[in-house]
């Protein structure tokens, strides 16, 4: 699956076409169904506006919201999103009470002049995800013929298909892979994701550095395996580093997290790194705590002394930060997935902040810095650094699967240039 040769919205003639766009409007709602964060809606505006400005007859938007488990549930209606979208676009938005069916087709086919239509939640139909849950919460597979019918129903609403929902790209859902139109292109959000991940995974400027944090080695094994033949250096940080330190150097780690299953593959990882001439950088000092809490009694430990029993490492120390900064400054492409410490608790946020500062400095001086979604994207947002980095991925699970070398069904389904 090449990331760099997929058709984009800018390659397609939209004039007088019904443009069917899969967006991600899975926004948080409060008890009164008020949207508490409209970031995802704002993120889709460039694609929606481009379709309107380039002469689309109708702009048909489809999305999921929450987990209604294949049944209509007013709690998960996209209706509040239609109101918010009208405000943001300063343009009327027609809300269709169903995402498929005769009435919806009539609304879409009547539309002219770039009319925006928002369809009701795709996941009100079991055929979107391919399954639903019964009263006992057991998964019930959707009927194959009904899935086909549902996909035909979506296909009937457009002349051109645009996918701008990267966060769902790792799911083979009907709206991601089942729309059968001659041209299937990425919207601006997906286009940017693909461009940047291609810059890292297909043609990186070197030296190429990956910074990997996280709790368990065993959770990141596919990621490490896929990146080792591609990178020049690898910083292993976060709780996962303790499994490396104890296994490789017999460092005392006290009550820090130790991944028994992961420890068995540490040797193989180091071996593979040597074979690929990859420099592995591990932390050398730690900020410790007697409990996992902001008001914990804190301490400091080095490799030589180790972490005493009753204490656990919740962040890395200044010497480690200096090592990271030096490695980051040498790199031309930096991919960061996983923070060095428990940044949610202020006493253990120092290394994360300083690593972020170094990443920002690298981006400002011309390196490509990509944040691979999840917790690290939260870090970038928390400290207001998103605009200062090359790219912050919006897809948690999708980014991870891409970095693990897996094919993303939603990307794979797009037309090639």
Curated annotation (Swiss-Prot):
Protein location: Cytoplasm, Cytosol; Mitochondrion
GO biological process, one term: negative regulation of acetyl-CoA biosynthetic process from pyruvate
Cofactors named for this entry: Mg(2+)
Disruption phenotype: Decreases cytosolic pyruvate levels and increases mitochondrial acetyl-CoA levels. Increases production of aflatoxin and increases the mumber of cellular autophagic vesicles.
Pathway: Carbohydrate degradation; glycolysis; pyruvate from D-glyceraldehyde 3-phosphate: step 2/5
Positions annotated to bind CDP: 214, 219, 238, 338, 343
Residues noted as binding ADP in the record, renumbered to the chain: 214, 238, 343
Outcome reported for the amino acid change (mutating residue 203 to A): Decreases cytosolic pyruvate levels. Decreases mitochondrial localization and phosphorylation of the protein. Increases the mumber of cellular autophagic vesicles
Catalytic activity of the protein: (2R)-3-phosphoglycerate + ATP = (2R)-3-phospho-glyceroyl phosphate + ADP
Positions that bind AMP: 215-216, 220, 239, 313, 344
Residues that hold ATP according to the record: 215, 220, 239, 313, 344, 375-376
EC number in record: 2.7.2.3
GO MF annotations, alphabetized: ADP binding; ATP binding; metal ion binding; phosphoglycerate kinase activity
Cellular component, GO, one term: mitochondrion
Modified residues (Phosphoserine): 203
InterPro entries named in the record: Phosphoglycerate_kinase (IPR001576), Phosphoglycerate_kinase_CS (IPR015911), Phosphoglycerate_kinase_N (IPR015824), Phosphoglycerate_kinase_sf (IPR036043)
Record PTM: Dephosphorylated by PTC1 and PTC2 at Ser-203; the protein is cytosolic when dephosphorylated.
HAMAP family tied to this protein: Phosphoglyc_kinase
PANTHER family on file: PHOSPHOGLYCERATE KINASE
Oligomeric and partner information: Monomer.
Protein known as: Phosphoglycerate kinase
């Amino acid at each position: 699956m090449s990331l760099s040769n997929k058709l984009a919205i800018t390659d397609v003639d939209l004039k007088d076409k019904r443009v069917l766009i899969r967006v991600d409007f899975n926004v948080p709602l409060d008890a009164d169904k008020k949207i508490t964060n409209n970031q995802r809606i704002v993120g889709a505006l460039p694609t929606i506006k481009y379709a309107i400005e380039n002469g689309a007859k109708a702009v048909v938007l489809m999305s999921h919201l929450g987990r209604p488990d294949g049944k209509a549930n007013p709690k998960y209606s996209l209706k509040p999103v239609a109101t918010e979208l009208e405000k943001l676009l300063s343009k009327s938005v027609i809300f269709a009470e169903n995402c498929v069916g005769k009435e919806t087709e009539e609304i879409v086919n009547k539309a002219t002049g770039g009319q925006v239509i928002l369809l009701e939640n795709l996941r009100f139909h079991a055929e979107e995800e391919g399954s639903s849950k019964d009263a006992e919460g057991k998964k019930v597979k959707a009927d194959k013929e009904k899935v086909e019918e549902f996909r035909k129903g979506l296909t009937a609403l457009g002349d051109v298909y645009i996918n701008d929902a990267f966060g769902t790209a790792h799911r083979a859902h009907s709206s991601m892979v089942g729309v059968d139109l001659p041209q299937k292109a990425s919207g601006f959000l997906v286009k940017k994701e693909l461009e940047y991940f291609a810059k890292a995974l297909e043609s990186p400027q070197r030296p190429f550095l990956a910074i990997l944090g996280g709790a368990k080695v065993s959770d990141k094994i596919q990621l490490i395996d896929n990146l080792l033949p591609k990178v020049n250096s690898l910083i292993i940080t976060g709780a996962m580093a303790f499994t490396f330190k104890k296994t490789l150097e017999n460092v005392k780690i006290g009550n820090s997290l130790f991944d028994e299953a992961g420890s068995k593959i540490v040797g193989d990882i180091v071996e593979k790194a040597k074979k690929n001439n990859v420099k592995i950088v591990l932390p050398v000092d730690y900020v410790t705590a007697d409990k996992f809490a902001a008001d914990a009694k804190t301490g400091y430990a080095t490799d030589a002394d180790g972490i005493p029993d009753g204490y656990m490492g919740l962040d890395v120390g200044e010497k480690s930060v200096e090592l990271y900064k030096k490695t980051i400054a040498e790199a031309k492409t930096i991919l960061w997935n996983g923070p060095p410490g428990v940044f949610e608790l202020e006493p253990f946020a120092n290394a994360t902040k300083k690593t972020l500062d170094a990443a920002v400095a690298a981006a400002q001086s011309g390196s490509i810095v990509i944040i691979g979604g999840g917790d690290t994207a939260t870090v970038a947002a928390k400290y207001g650094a998103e605009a200062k980095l090359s790219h912050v991925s919006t897809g948690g699970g999708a980014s991870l699967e891409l970095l693990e070398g897996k094919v993303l069904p939603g990307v794979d389904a797009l037309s090639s240039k």
